[in-house]
Amino acid sequence: MFGFLKQVGDYTRDAVDAARNLAQGFSVTFDHMKRRPVTVQYPYEKLIPSERYRGRIHYEFDKCIACEVCVRVCPINLPVVDWVMNKATKKKELRNYSIDFGVCIFCGNCVEYCPTNCLSMTEEYELAAFDRHSLNYDNVALGRLPTSVTTDPSVQPLRELAYLPAGEMDPHGVPNDRPRAGQLPSQVLETLAPPAKVGAKNEGQSTGTTQEGEA
């Protein structure tokens, strides 16, 4: 008799614990149901990358001097620089330049240390291909100008949450011309710039006035 009552008590306790756990799980689910959607209907909607987004690398063949600094600073020695030495001019002549984006980690070291600024990071992130060998971009493919999300008429560009105007939580319906929350990198640099020396300017003006008076 006591064994049967113990089994009933254990079963009731387990049922109460299960109901409590279900209630906790559903409370989290119902709480998220009240929130606005944060998903993007890709590819009809695309997020606008940030100003310093590290996407596909853009390469300018005419600026490259084949110094191979990008190869030395790359953590995996990825860029392939094909050049020959011109005996007449005693300078390197670049033949081909390629980067395999299937291996690239988009760290940006090559862009940062390039002495001629022939490399730059773009906002292009759609590099998917059916063949991994197609991800090996030569200098012609690297020289193609990137396509911006905001200029594509078939896509609705959406801002990321950190770049929405103050008080907005849903990027849908927010026009692109509305000011974003915070400042742009160029505006931050302007605020960090040292102020002009007003005393030196006034001193120069007073000196010029004195010279004019003496004349």
Swiss-Prot record:
Known function: NDH-1 shuttles electrons from an unknown electron donor, via FMN and iron-sulfur (Fe-S) centers, to quinones in the respiratory and/or the photosynthetic chain. The immediate electron acceptor for the enzyme in this species is believed to be plastoquinone. Couples the redox reaction to proton translocation, and thus conserves the redox energy in a proton gradient.
Region annotated Disordered, chain positions: 166-215
Organism of origin: Parasynechococcus marenigrum (strain WH8102)
The enzyme's E.C. designation: 7.1.1.-
Family in the record: Belongs to the complex I 23 kDa subunit family.
Keyword Membrane recorded: yes
Any GO MF annotation of the entry: NADH dehydrogenase (ubiquinone) activity
Protein name (database record): NAD(P)H-quinone oxidoreductase subunit I
Membrane topology: Peripheral membrane protein
UniProt xrefs under SUPFAM superfamilies: 4Fe-4S ferredoxins
Sorted UniProt keywords: 4Fe-4S, Iron, Iron-sulfur, Membrane, Metal-binding, NAD, NADP, Plastoquinone, Quinone, Repeat, Thylakoid, Translocase
